Regions:
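Low-complexity, S/T/G/P-rich flexible repeat/linker segments used as non-globular hinges
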Residues: 274-293
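C-terminal helical cap and adjacent loop that interface with cofactors, partners, or active-site loops
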Residues: 245
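Short capping/connector residues at structural and topological boundaries
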Residues: 39, 51, 72-74, 288, ...
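Alpha-helical hydrophobic packing sites
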Residues: 17, 223, 290-293
Length: 293
């Protein structure tokens, strides 16, 4: 009868060691794949949020000061900036279609801002016209021709301006008055004047900073001569001469990623290293303000 044999103790220990080594390699490969997947997801999340906010703010800043037709100097006002938290806009506010606050902690008594961040207000008319029969009584609208402008509630009798032929009613457009800011939970939000009420809309999460830099024309050639992060608040001439707005957005991912050991320098600010497990990216872009009167 053939004698049965088995593994020796040494052979068993070697096989166990090889098995552990192979298992460790497979685990390491799996963990690296998971980490790489999370990193790709986090990077895509940040890029998508930056792209969305970039497209939105570029469009809004570009349209700032668009009120339909070009109007004459009788719209001009040297009055200081009025309370921009109000839900009762006035024609004299239209002379500052771009207005901002620097390094704020609160806004409109009830909004807590991300400490040190900026606030941007955009005033403009819709690019679409509204028929007199479709006006909403509580909504603010603008009507303008080449000589005058009306800002009033949506009652057809309020809008009497005519085209150059003296017969055709001048176009009526919905009035937009929007505040852009980051709250103390790192959420980028927009406060919109809709139907006579200020409505807050969440836009994106994970904004670690929002800074603005303004290109100001000092010699009336419509070209920025100085770049300032803090134009004089309530000073009409400073804001009337803003020709460009540069936006800086520091955006972080929702998902965990590799530790962030970078330092970010922008608009006179320095942030980092933050040393947390978030993917971050600094987005910046400049937009011309082409509709100042």
């Amino acid at each position: 009868m053939k004698k049965q044999t088995g593994f020796t103790l040494i052979e068993l220990m070697i096989s166990l060691a090889l098995g552990l080594a192979i298992s460790w390699v497979m685990l390491d490969v799996s963990l690296n794949a998971v980490r790489n997947g999370q990193d790709i997801t986090s990077n895509g999340d940040v890029i998508e949020k930056g792209r969305f906010m970039g497209d939105l703010l570029k469009r809004e800043i570009k349209h700032a000061g668009f009120f339909g037709r070009i109007v004459s100097a009788n719209v001009q006002s040297n009055s200081p900036q009025t309370n921009w938290c109000t839900n009762a806009p006035a024609v004299k506010q239209l002379t500052t279609p771009v207005f901002g606050l620097d390094n704020q902690s609160s806004l409109c008594s009830s909004i807590n801002l991300l400490a040190g961040s900026d606030v941007l207000m955009i005033r403009r008319a819709s690019t679409l016209t509204t028929a007199p029969g479709s006006l909403v009584a509580s909504q603010d609208y603008i009507q303008s021709n080449f000589e005058d402008i009306i800002l009033a509630k949506g009652v057809a009798a309020n809008f009497t301006l005519k085209e150059i032929d003296g017969v055709t009613l001048a176009p009526i457009r919905e009035y937009h008055q929007d505040l852009y800011y980051v709250d103390n939970n790192n959420n980028f939000k927009r406060r919109r004047l809709i139907n006579g009420s200020n409505i807050i809309e969440p836009l994106i999460e994970g904004v670690d900073d929002f800074q603005l830099q303004y290109g100001i024309d000092t010699n009336d050639d419509n070209i920025p001569d100085t770049f300032n992060t803090t134009p004089i608040s309530n000073d009409y001439s400073s804001w009337q001469n803003v020709k460009t707005v540069t936006v800086f957005l520091l955006i972080s991912s929702e998902y965990s990623s590799l530790p962030d050991d970078k330092t970010y320098n922008y608009a006179g600010q320095t942030k980092g290293p933050l040393n947390d497990s978030k993917k971050r990216r600094l987005f910046s872009f400049s937009v011309s303000v082409g509709n100042q009167y």
